[in-house]
Each structure stands twice: as structure tokens, then as C-alpha cells.
């Protein structure tokens, strides 16, 4: 089979949608499958929940990206064990620690790499605010120290976290592309310098959508060049509920995040072509 882009929908996105009260896990996964997504993104922090989620997804022929939040080397072990037992396409790790000494950060990443070598699915480290990878420049230092570091690229966190403005400076673009050179999976969301999640249909979002498309095209191309002929790249549509989503005076989301997820899927497909 040729290289392919697998587009996933986040179960987190399915919370508090404008379309009505929250559905059950089974209903949400069924809706995602019926809409033609290739898989789901799910929390992977509880054994019983992981088992149930994996079983329902498997029944719909959906792949699963698990999300773990370990705060130490050993804290990653349960998520790996559940992935091996129940089945994962890959595990996404938000490193829930914030050491001031980069040597501690490097040792933790190397420890996780050793554990990841024992399982038959990929393990990626997410670029995320409030985590080990909180700062773009620190993440670049980590890449220097751990050159085979596998990342899940969620660029929205760096755009808003560093208040990156348009037009993006040449220096910042080089930094972002270095992150993309290590991206083995993507989380899809469009941010601006001041907002982590822009409504996709609002006119002021258009320049930022174009910027993210430029980055995603670059990252997809680089991934294709270095990956095997039948490799799979994943793109998770991850439009979070409030406070990520912007609310109106009635307390409801200003936009329909389910419809936006379908729109974002088409953007990802466009960037892949």
C-alpha cells in the first residue's frame, strides 16, 4: 500500500457540542465512523476506559491514538501496557513535568524512548503548553540533545504561547520547520497570536489558516521523504470545548465544532495532495 494520511477525530471535541447534550461513548464513536474518519483520539489514562474505547473503535474499524500524561519515566508504563493489550495505532504523550534543568528533561525523554522500544506501536511526544515541551526554544534544545525524538506537532500551542504574529519572521519559520522535521503525527487546530483556537469560518482566521496550511504542507512533505513506502501519517482534528472554544454571551459555542472538524479534515486532505 502507498503512504497514506489517516484523519482522526478527537473524542474531546465531542464534548458539549452545540448540537445537543453529550452522547454516549458508543454513540460518539459511531458518529465519527459514519462520517468517514479513519480513527479517534482518546484519553489513555484509565485501563477500563481504554479497554472499552478500543473495543468500540475496533468494531467500527477505527484506529486509536491514545493520550497519556506521565509525570515520570515509570508513569508511562501503564499506558504502554494497555496499548499492547488492547491495541493502539500510536501513543501520544503530553509530558506532565516541567523541570528547570534540561538534563532532567533529556533523561526523561531517553527513558521513555527505552520503554517505547519494547512495544510494537509508535510513541510520540506532543508539543503542548504547560508541559515539558511548553517552549519552542526549549523543544529545539531537546531535539538537539535527542536527535531521534518523535513529535506530535500541535503548532497552535507555540503560535499562541509565543505570540507569533503575521507575517511570521524568517527566524521563527526556521524554528517551526525544525519541529516539523521531527513530526510523526499532527494535531489539527488553527491559532493566532492571542487565541489558541480560531473559529474557522470567521474572516479574520483566513490568514492564519493559510499560514498553518503552509506549515502542514511542509511537514507532510518532509514526512513523506523520510518515511517508508507504506507508512501512515495521522492528523487528529482536535477542536476543544470551552475554554478552548470561544463562547457567546449565552454561554454557548460561537461555532459548530463538529462541522468545523469536517472542514478541518478537508484542509488536511488538501495539504496532503
Provide a role label for each language-model segment:
Residues 1-84, 266-272:
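N-terminal pre-domain/capping segments
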Residues 3-15, 40-42, 62-68, 91-93, ...:
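Hydrophobic faces of well-ordered beta-strands that scaffold small-molecule active sites
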Residues 16, 160-163, 190-204, 231-250:
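Flexible glycine/acidic-rich beta-alpha junction loops that bind and position SAM and/or redox cofactors
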Residues 25-30, 50-54, 76-80, 106-113, ...:
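Generic structural signal for well-ordered alpha-helices
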Residues 60-151, 160:
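Active-site acidic/histidine proton-transfer and metal-coordination neighborhood
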Residues 118-203:
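Acidic/histidine-rich catalytic cores of soluble enzymes
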Residues 174, 208-232:
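A short, acidic, amphipathic alpha-helical segment used as a generic capping/interface helix at domain edges
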Residues 246-273:
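Short, low-complexity, polybasic intrinsically disordered segments
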Amino acid at each position: 500500500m502507498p503512504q497514506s494520511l489517516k484523519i482522526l477525530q478527537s473524542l474531546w471535541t465531542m464534548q458539549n457540542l452545540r448540537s445537543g447534550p453529550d452522547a454516549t461513548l458508543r454513540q460518539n464513536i459511531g458518529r465519527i465512523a459514519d462520517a468517514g474518519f479513519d480513527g479517534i483520539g482518546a484519553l489513555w489514562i484509565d485501563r477500563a476506559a481504554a479497554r472499552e474505547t478500543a473495543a468500540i473503535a475496533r468494531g467500527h474499524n477505527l484506529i486509536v491514538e491514545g493520550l497519556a500524561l506521565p509525570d515520570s519515566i515509570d508513569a508511562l508504563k501503564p499506558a504502554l501496557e494497555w496499548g499492547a493489550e488492547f491495541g493502539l495505532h500510536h501513543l501520544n504523550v503530553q509530558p506532565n513535568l516541567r523541570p528547570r534543568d534540561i538534563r532532567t528533561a533529556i533523561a526523561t525523554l531517553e527513558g521513555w524512548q527505552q520503554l517505547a522500544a519494547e512495544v510494537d506501536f509508535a510513541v510520540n511526544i506532543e508539543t503542548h503548553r504547560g508541559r515539558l515541551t511548553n517552549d519552542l526554544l526549549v523543544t529545539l534544545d531537546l531535539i538537539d540533545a535527542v536527535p531521534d525524538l518523535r513529535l506530535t506537532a500541535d503548532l497552535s500551542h507555540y503560535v499562541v504561547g509565543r505570540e507569533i504574529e503575521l507575517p511570521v519572521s524568517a527566524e521563527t519559520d526556521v524554528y517551526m520547520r525544525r519541529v516539523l522535521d521531527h513530526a510523526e503525527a499532527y494535531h489539527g487546530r488553527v491559532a493566532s497570536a492571542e487565541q489558541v483556537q480560531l473559529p474557522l469560518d470567521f474572516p479574520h482566521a483566513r490568514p492564519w489558516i493559510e499560514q498553518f496550511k503552509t506549515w502542514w504542507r511542509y511537514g507532510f512533505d518532509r514526512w513523506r521523504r523520510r518515511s517508508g513506502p507504506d507508512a501512515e501519517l495521522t492528523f487528529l482534528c482536535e477542536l476543544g470545548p470551552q475554554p478552548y472554544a470561544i463562547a457567546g454571551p449565552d454561554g454557548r459555542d460561537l461555532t459548530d465544532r463538529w462541522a468545523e472538524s469536517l472542514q478541518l479534515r478537508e484542509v488536511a486532505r488538501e495539504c496532503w495532495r
